[in-house]
Amino acid sequence: MKPTRRRFLQANLLGGVAATFPFSTLGADSTAAGQGSYNPRYRRLDEILKEPVLKREFFSTPIIIESLELLRYKDSFLCRVRSRDGAEGISVGHSGLNALYPIFTHNLQQFFIGKDARDLDLLLEKVFIYGFNFRYNGISIGTPLATIEFAILDLLGRVAGKSLGQLIGDVQQPEVTVYQATEYREKSVEESLELIKRDVAEYNAHALKIKIGGLMFMTTDINAVGPPGRTEKIIPLIRKTFGDSMALFADANGFYSVDEAIRVGKLLEEYRYGFFEEPVMFDWREETRQVASALQLPIALGEQEYSLHGFRWVIANDAVEIVQPDNYYFGGMVRSMQVARMAAAFGKKCTPHMSGGGLGFLYMMHFVSVLSNPMPHHEFKGLRTNVQFECKTSPLKVVDGKIRVPTGPGLGVEIDPGFIGKHQRISG
């Protein structure tokens, strides 16, 4: 990374699959990095990917998975896992399971039955091979797989008396500092500003991310475009409105071409934004690198990335300074931690993308709590949830821009048995 980009990152942010997956090193790029898989940077990342994530030393005897269930009540999904010796874990599924639950029941569920939960790292590798599951990729397999992993981690945490974070790392952030993520791309600048001010005020946010560009994902109108000139107007207006003390970030969701991304990136630099998320489409890795090379502004990426190999490339080739694996979309905390470790090896930061709904904010908090290379602020979309639960170790309120991470075993909360009881088992 250029030294000036490193200084930009520090000044603006602080101030304001390879060895683990047999297919992941095939086709490694040999142009940008020079020597493909033999490049020293790739070799370093491959060594990191060999390192276990789950702290198996907490468990002296096998923990055999006896049952794994997906439960549904209307649009709510829970995963419940039980071991042969009676231990139980539960997770809250992503709303995307409305469309994806058949992959849970048909492609993943049976694979885990009878396995030792202590082998979680290996299970998360081999499940992609089972039934050629790697053909599905992306959120289609990542979301149901994460739902399973979260439940297994909850079970293991309860057995060991450890939080989810403690199972995959050492707690370094007992509180997570958040940024308010906002939407409103399709609305006028004036209406967007009022809604953003409302969101910031609700949680007294000290950091904020806005949407830019014109990706009209919310409509079936193939001719839809965003309000003319919205991006060019809102970037300086947000800085003027919230002042120099507010940390600002921007997300294009892959809308721009390389040239347009560079143009908009320079405007973001002028108004001291902290990072530019997905300036071009997520799988345009070489184009992302071109944008990064032209800007001092750090580039962030990872919400849509579905492979360890993809993250390996963008890290090794300095296409990004910030990685953003989504714990749900990417298949869980173990895989996301592998990404964070790769990033740390080359001085890059990690801040997970956070899916809204359910208890996504809790999984995000546990993950961030053990990062060695966290960003100063992490994505937050509010505390609203349909899940009925109790947390005895944290008020789960935003205070001075921070939320205290639960310290109880597993997820650190107790989901209301009555709420669980409303859910019915989905059979294959």
Enumerate the predicted regions with their spans:
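Short beta-strand elements
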Residues: 77-85, 395
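Conserved, mostly hydrophobic/aromatic
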Residues: 86, 148, 161, 251, ...
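C-terminal segment of N-terminal export signals and the immediately downstream linker at the start
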Residues: 23-71, 88
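N-terminal export signals
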Residues: 1-2, 7-34
